[in-house]
Regions:
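N-terminal secretory targeting modules
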Residues: 3, 21-198, 208-211, 405-407, ...
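Active-site flanking residues adjacent to catalytic metal/cofactor-binding acidic residues
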Residues: 198-200, 316, 359
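Short beta-strand segments at enzyme active-site cores
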Residues: 267-270, 313-317
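N-terminal signal peptide c-region/cleavage motif recognized by signal peptidases
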Residues: 16-20
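Bacterial N-terminal signal peptides that target proteins for export
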Residues: 1-8
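Conserved SGNH/GDSL esterase-like catalytic core that processes O-acyl groups on lipids
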Residues: 31, 52-60, 75, 83, ...
């Protein structure tokens, strides 16, 4: 081959590779529910699910952030000790609509090994931004339930038999926990990306109105969808930064629940209040409270992981919580010395923390007349969790340019890059 022909061949190979890369689908995380290990009957809170299912269908609603021409669904057996057999699964574009069968390597059923998860094959179902989908999963054999998401803030249903392709369920019972489904990804333009919010019950939406998508991450998703940015929640009620709580510690699950999400470009960290306040309560009677230095080291570790992956990481100050959880088994959750540690941590986050930017949620939610308390207009009533108005105020307190690194101010078109 002469020199000219070599150059032509090289150019053609390069063009072929570029075309292949350009045609590869760009997947973005559009919805998430972080998995948790199921706890025993002796725990402070009921699990809200049966110990096992056998020949049952589980149906749940998930409002995605961004839409696209195709989607795929992630099912999890993260904490299972035996294989999870799925006999069928489907997605319906809305409640009462005809479900579309999901496939896994071309088959309607799938076996998920212990500690594993599986992505479905891409489903050619065009969905819109902020669309509420219904996902159904059928388990044909006796299946101990060992992985769930406890605080779904959404009604789900358990029905006998294989009803995964039924428009309406027959003889269904309700729960607010989630099973099997941990993520929905959409095919999107190459400019689309996602923001993951890792946190505890405040991010999980513990007191948000049921079935109304009023978590603070829902409000943030509504702000960012027009810019082609999805928001997915990695909140776990009872979650902690340094130690396992009602789920793995944020340090342990950060890669899985945040950095490994497709299309992630920024992460928001709002976690730590349970680290400060659980010790000495019914949750952790004999545990020592972490020091300021230990909490700082935990935040630095998260920031280091994110930066090594080229992901922007934004911290959030811990909101006020004076008088939290009155009249409950956790009415000692708040103590003045715990609040002093929160204030020290917030001061450090504002001035010397390891994050690329900081969202001052403490300032956004506090009562100006009593800064240790949440403003009444934002308080759900338990003095720890914001209500719907408080969740909206949190989302509105986010500087989008700071969150996205100044790369998210242009309107977004779904036709771009597909």
């Amino acid at each position: 081959m002469n020199r000219f022909n070599q150059l032509v061949a090289t150019a053609l190979i390069g063009l072929s590779g570029a075309a292949s890369a350009a045609s590869a689908p760009h997947w973005v995380a559009s919805w998430q529910a972080s998995p948790q290990p199921v706890w025993g009957a002796d725990f402070l809170f009921p699990s809200l699910i049966p110990a096992s299912l056998h020949d049952h269908t589980f149906r749940q609603t998930a409002r995605i952030s961004l839409g696209g021409p195709r989607l795929r669904v992630r099912l999890s057996n993260a904490y299972g000790t035996q294989p999870l057999r799925i006999g069928g699964a489907s997605v319906a574009p809305q409640a009462g609509a005809t479900p579309h069968q999901l496939r896994f390597d071309g088959r309607p059923e799938v076996l998920i090994g212990p500690g594993q998860e599986r992505l479905s094959d891409p489903l050619p179902l065009a969905v819109q931004d902020r669309q509420a989908l219904q996902v159904s999963v059928f388990v044909p054999e006796s299946t101990p339930l060992q992985t769930f998401h406890w605080d779904g803030r959404q009604t789900s249903w358990i029905a006998p038999g294989d009803q995964s392709l039924a428009r309406e369920l027959d003889r269904a019972s309700a729960t607010t926990a989630r099973l099997f489904l941990t993520g929905i990804e959409v095919e999107a333009p190459t400019s689309a990306r996602s923001v993951v919010v890792i946190g505890d019950s405040i991010t999980d939406g513990a007191t948000a109105s049921l079935d109304r998508d009023q978590r603070w991450t829902d409000h943030l998703a509504a702000r960012l969808a027009p810019q082609g940015v999805a928001v997915v929640s990695a909140g776990i009620s009872g979650g902690r930064l340094l130690r396992d709580g009602m789920g793995e510690a944020a340090l342990a699950r950060f890669q899985r629940d945040a950095l490994d999400q497709p299309g992630v470009s920024s992460v928001i960290v709002l976690i730590g209040i349970n680290d400060i306040s659980w010790p000495g309560t019914a949750f952790a009677r004999k545990q020592a409270r972490p020091t300021l230095a230990e909490l700082q080291a935990g935040y630095r570790a998260l920031a280091g992981q994110a930066h090594r992956r080229g992901v922007r990481i934004v911290g959030a100050t811990l909101p006020p919580f004076a008088g939290a959880l009155p009249g409950t088994p956790l009415d000692d959750y708040y103590q003045p010395d715990k609040d002093a540690l929160r204030s020290q941590l917030n001061a450090w986050l504002r001035t010397d923390g390891p994050f690329d930017a900081v969202i001052d949620l403490d300032a956004a939610l506090r009562d100006p007349a009593d800064p240790s308390r949440m403003a009444a207009a934002y308080d759900s009533g338990d003095h720890l969790h914001p209500g719907d108005a408080g969740n909206r105020a949190m989302a509105e307190a986010v500087d989008l340019d700071a969150l996205l690194g100044g790369q998210g101010s242009e309107p977004f078109s779904h036709g771009e890059g597909l």
